Amino acid sequence: MPVPRSRHDHYPRDDAARCRRIREAVAKLDAHWCSADTAPGGLFAAIDAVADQPPDRVIARLLPWLADTGWLTARLGEALALLAADPFARPPLRPVGGGDGGSGGLILAERGAVRIALHIHPAAAAAPTHAVFVPGRAAIRVLAAAGASLCLHQVTVSAAEEAGGFTASAAAPCHSAPPRALADGEILHLDTARQSYSLTGAQGDVLLLELTVQPPTPLPIRSYDLASRRLAQVSASQRDASFRTMALTLLRHLGRPDAAPLFAEATQAGDFALRWHAMRELIALAPAAALPRLTAMATADPHPEVRRAAQATLALYPKPSPSGEGSETCQLAG
């Protein structure tokens, strides 16, 4: 059965020749960029040369790519030329963020733990209410300050927490510095496990070129409420764990009980935030299937807060009656 087309859908899918030209033009530009990036002196080659270095060293070695943005100007010019030739072409630049009118951007390069991205903070974006701390290092060049004020946020993280001993109950509060003017051309250096920032008062769109290094770590991503300065949420920091988190949520929304083994497997992952997220989603999807893993988690999970959460959730399960009724299904508020 054909899918009805939106009146806003003007993509020329019925023009086979034009669609072929679009695909060929995009593929040609992608191949050109890949060739330039992997050649000696190219961006990928520069990243690969420091792949085994500590994050601070990686940042230092790649800073020239922030200082001289001629390569970025050329790349955006080629992307615009592709769009000028056909507005339905999609330049080979992966978008990130931008939902609900918030900040978004384009990923310019990503190799292992290293990412270089162009970020836009719209002038009309809502005032930030949370500060997010993502383990790693970052260097951020301000391409257009647009009159914005910068507020830096800081939180203390101990060596034990970085090594895998983080608990929400012992998390330090967040502290914010007084706002200051953001300046065109300045470069911010952040230990993003402990430092974050927010922007306010911009008179136009703020444009940032951001270099981040986020190697695998047991320390989770932490979101703090700026009003109370208290920890509001934790989530998996490792990218594969983050992708699995999103995939499990999607499977639960799709109502796929046949995928329960994937959820059960994730409840034994190394990342405690992923383990508990998978458990919650499995309970919402298939409570009976979740019960054996929840029982094991309540007694043997290596993280104390996951054990306590599992024990509290286990107490919500109805006790089976002597006849066995009520032992197979139950309703739990998610």
Briefly describe each language-model feature range.
Residues 2, 10-114, 226:
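A short, N-terminal "cap"/entry segment at the start of jelly-roll beta-barrel domains
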Residues 114-135, 181-183, 190-193:
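Conserved short histidine dyad/triad with adjacent acidic residue
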Residues 135-155:
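Short, conserved beta-strand element in jelly-roll/cupin
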Residues 139-141, 187, 202-221:
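A short hydrophobic beta-strand segment most commonly corresponding to one strand
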Residues 140, 155-196:
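Short acidic-glycine-tyrosine-enriched beta hairpin
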Residues 225-232, 256-267, 288-299, 320-331:
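Amphipathic alpha-helical scaffolding segments comprising HEAT/armadillo-like alpha-solenoid repeats
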Residues 235-236, 251, 266-270, 298-302:
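Alpha-solenoid helical repeat architecture
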Residues 244-254, 276-285, 308-318:
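Structural detector for internal amphipathic alpha-helices that build alpha-solenoid repeat scaffolds
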